[in-house]
């Protein structure tokens, strides 16, 4: 968390409450961070994926499309060929998201011969909308505060730009 603050050039956030997201193949979590006199910060996971993690959804989609693992950057490049505007309603259970439906939908799209660039964009947009729903749920409950994203998936430009526009979020270098 402290490395992410350093990366985004906001070390002063350590003195305030903020939400730190870690979005990778191993975790998809939102952590409420509060200052603590004894331990510098206190961190509490307040929202997470209940099954598949964001990076897993991205990589599994890429592998299904024949992209070498890890797939994030190549999947993002492929998605740029799509002009589709997907209407995505993330699966939320309270403040937590479920991402396993992305893989199921991707498999169906591939079997229905959807263009690979549309499949790629669908997967990325699905992850983005899930992260957006997590951010909305957390800020609805805990109040508006800075959002700091870190982890490999946060390097996706489409996801980063969308969440910056919606929430003024900060993104650490992956």
Where are the regions a protein language model picked out?
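Short, acidic/small-residue loops that bind anionic groups at enzyme active sites
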Residues: 1-2, 49-51, 168-171
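Buried hydrophobic packing segments
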Residues: 1-5, 58-61, 135
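Active-site metal-binding loops of divalent metal-dependent hydrolases
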Residues: 26, 151-153
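Active-site catalytic microenvironments in core metabolic enzymes, especially phosphate/sugar-handling
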Residues: 25, 169-174
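Conserved phosphate-binding catalytic cores of ATP/NTP-utilizing and phosphoryl-transfer enzymes
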Residues: 1-18
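A short helix-loop
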Residues: 14-16, 21-24, 29-114
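A contiguous, well-structured pocket-lining segment that forms one wall/lid of small-molecule binding clefts
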Residues: 77-147, 154-171
């Amino acid at each position: 968390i402290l490395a992410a603050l350093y990366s985004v050039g906001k070390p002063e956030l350590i003195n305030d409450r903020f939400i730190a997201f870690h979005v990778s193949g191993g975790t998809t979590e939102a952590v409420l961070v509060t200052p603590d006199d004894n331990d510098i910060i206190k961190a509490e996971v307040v929202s997470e994926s209940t099954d598949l993690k964001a990076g897993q959804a991205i990589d599994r989609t890429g592998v299904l499309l024949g992209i070498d693992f890890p797939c994030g950057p190549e999947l993002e490049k492929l998605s740029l060929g799509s002009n589709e505007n997907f209407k995505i309603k993330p699966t939320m259970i309270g403040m937590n998201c479920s991402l396993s439906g992305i893989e199921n939908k991707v498999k169906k799209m591939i079997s229905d011969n959807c263009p690979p660039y549309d499949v790629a964009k669908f997967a990325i947009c699905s992850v983005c909308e899930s992260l957006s729903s997590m951010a909305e749920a957390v800020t609805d409950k805990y109040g508006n505060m800075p959002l700091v994203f870190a982890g490999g998936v946060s390097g996706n430009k489409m996801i980063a730009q969308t969440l910056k526009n919606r929430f003024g979020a900060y993104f650490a270098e992956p």
